[in-house]
Amino acid sequence: MRIAAISVAPIFPNYVIGGSQKILADVTAGLKNLGHDVQIWCTATESHNGDFDVDGVAVHPELQFRGSFPSTHQVSPVALARSAETLRNAAEWADRVYLHADAVYLRHALEGAEIIRSIHDYVYEEALLSTLSLPADVTIVPSNYLKHCIEATVAFSGKKTIEQVVVISNGVHVPETTPVPTLPDGILPRGEKDLILLFPHRPIPTKGLDEAIRTAVEVQKIEPTRNVRLLIPAYPTNANFDDLAGSTDELMELVSDLGGVDIVEFHSWLSPTEMSGYYASGDVTLCIGSFVESFGLVPIESVANGTPAVCASVGAFRQFADIDGIIPVPYGQIEASTQAVLSAAGGSADLIESGRSQIIHTYSPESMVEGYESVISRTLSEARKIELAADDQLLLAPWCDIQGQEIYDDYTATRLQYPHLVSALKVNLGLVWPDPLLLSASLDAEVRHAKERGILIPKYVIG
């Protein structure tokens, strides 16, 4: 089968920006190895110089979008028209069109094509609008969390139909043995008293840069005899993938403001082949931001390569609570993050090996590729009906989580006290009747407040 993979985000031959682009490379290479003719069309940047291969898959940087998020299509009319022509030619060549991390607004250029898309975030406007406004025959998502967020949003918005939404977990390679620790070029070798913390993320605020620095500073205060080192990758200067990413000068200013000058060390952006040794070089990996992850590769990759991770209980990170070697903490609570780092750093090797075994069985790269092939190559089903339930029940929105007597909202990064509502939701399996005649005055007030904030949404049915 000829498969045209389309990526609005640029792809580069020597490095990968973000987990989504890594998944694209793994999936397309896997499909090619299974005998399919796969080619990728992506956005061109000044760094590109013609076609190239990624793991044997041809890449054509021919789309003339902006190359950074958000507002990917904010280019000239001529650039949009030429991008439409490129999309049309790719669709005419292909048996199936795969829109990776769908953000293709120019759907008229794909008219008549059988479209399978994937969604890998539900934060940027491109992903949100794609699921509400742009047609596809099937949508692939990496987690039940994202599936439920999309379905709830579509139902709540008043749409009457929805395509099949299929969960295919991202695949993570687990080495047979823990890799040899390898620090990046320019970083001093590990010292005897070092406690190395890793922050292998794009340097944007919601990824937890501020929280990571604050946590590292607190760890150093508690462990004055240790030499705490927080390693942070500097964004590639020619990538321009995310407008929210800070420059090195801006990052250094933040480090100084938070008292981390003697703790933080910046290094160059690493290629996928360098990541295993990098993870293995750390004592703990930090994933403690407010970014609403739709899967979150970093903590799983970290444990796979022998290093425990501390994760904020945000978005799809919550699905990793039972993976040994991953410690969940409430977002924004630096004291909890600090204690979790100290606990993780003192954890046993057996715990990490148990986590590695869990990852092998749950997040296999082979299963991921087989799942994508099954969805992309099979006979496509028709859209399903979706509507609000007739009984007027409210349910806890999938982007919210009960944490103690509080409810955390992923999209506002806030935690509010709802003691009566929390008790009712626990008893009624996440549902509540909004009838003031059936509720106490205090519960009714909490229900009304939560409904207004989008914490409670109408129950929906998919036919």
For each feature predicted by the language model, list its residue ranges.
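N-terminal strand-loop element at the rim of the active site
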Residues: S7-N14, G30-S71
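A short, active-site helix/loop in glycosyltransferases that binds the activated sugar's phosphate group
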Residues: E126-L128, A136-V167, V172-V174
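Conserved donor-binding/catalytic core segment of Leloir-type glycosyltransferases
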Residues: I140, P189-K207, I213-E218, L231
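Nucleotide-activated donor-binding/catalytic signature segment of Leloir-type glycosyltransferases, i.e.
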Residues: L244-W269
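Short alpha-helical donor nucleotide-sugar binding micro-motif in glycosyltransferases
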Residues: W269, Y278-G282
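Short hydrophobic beta-strand element within catalytic cores of glycosyltransferases
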Residues: P308-C311
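Conserved acidic donor-binding segment of nucleotide-sugar-dependent glycosyltransferases
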Residues: I323-E335, L342-S348
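A charged, aromatic-enriched C-terminal amphipathic alpha-helix characteristic of glycosyltransferases
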Residues: G346-S377, S381-R384
